[in-house]
């Protein structure tokens, strides 16, 4: 089996595939408040195209798949997509990133279809702040979804928290203490300038350095732990707590040297790097395996060693222009 390596000898065995650009929220770090019309239905990958894409990737050594959006649970066929992907020979792990609003209704069917893991976006515990960040969301639906999913015993549930200055950076300890009685991995993620102006990003960016200081001030004894997989999160557990917390810092501490992932947009383009404008249309190649393989390899051959979110060493400010797609159009 030919496996997927880039020019820096990084093995790529993980695909993140967006199955829709549509979302029922407009989170401030993902979409603009207005505009950004959704793709017409025929521009979005069909269920059969998604399954064929992943089948091709499995023949190239990919064994891990994450389904993203937009909001993937908006697709009425999402359970069938999960089931069919999980049935592909070579695919060992299937997960979904969701805002959780429909999770209470769909978690059981997803588990029965073979879904292994869940990442749920929850940027705050405060209802009004949640409504502000998401531009209208109801946090109680998310909390119900988390409770439902927890009772079903997925392999792992992770909560994604994008830190935004002045909005949720005062809740760090609340999230860490949530792991005392909840078997989840809370992940703090640095706000990235994707689809945002650099000036706006500069005002809202929060580095993760303060997490350890807050833990020490609160008298929390924490230690590093290893979680399954080779993702970008540095993980820790407070002594005596059930769950854990992780730090994902794409800005202040790059993890590019171990990158093993490829992204497929909802309209069928491959992005070898989240913050890299180059894209290759692989949708038109999916039923010609040799052409597909060549297209994927071409994307890998052009993959940069590091992303373009390069920091100036003096003032920690990005000095590169952001990618042209918004996050909802790439796949979170």
UniProtKB/Swiss-Prot annotation:
Keywords: 4Fe-4S, GTP-binding, Iron, Iron-sulfur, Lyase, Metal-binding, Molybdenum cofactor biosynthesis, Nucleotide-binding, S-adenosyl-L-methionine
Electron transport as UniProt keyword: no
Binding-site positions, S-adenosyl-L-methionine: 29, 70, 121, 192
Annotated catalysed reactions: GTP + AH2 + S-adenosyl-L-methionine = (8S)-3',8-cyclo-7,8-dihydroguanosine 5'-triphosphate + 5'-deoxyadenosine + L-methionine + A + H(+)
Taxonomy, superkingdom: Bacteria
Binding site for GTP: 16, 66, 97, 158, 261-263
GO molecular function: 4 iron, 4 sulfur cluster binding; cyclic pyranopterin monophosphate synthase activity; GTP 3',8'-cyclase activity; GTP binding; metal ion binding; S-adenosyl-L-methionine binding
HAMAP family xrefs: MoaA_B
Oligomer status and interactors: Monomer and homodimer.
Family: Belongs to the radical SAM superfamily. MoaA family.
NCBIfam families (alphabetical): moaA (TIGR02666), PRK00164.2-1 (NF001199)
Protein's UniProt name: GTP 3',8-cyclase
Gene field: moaA
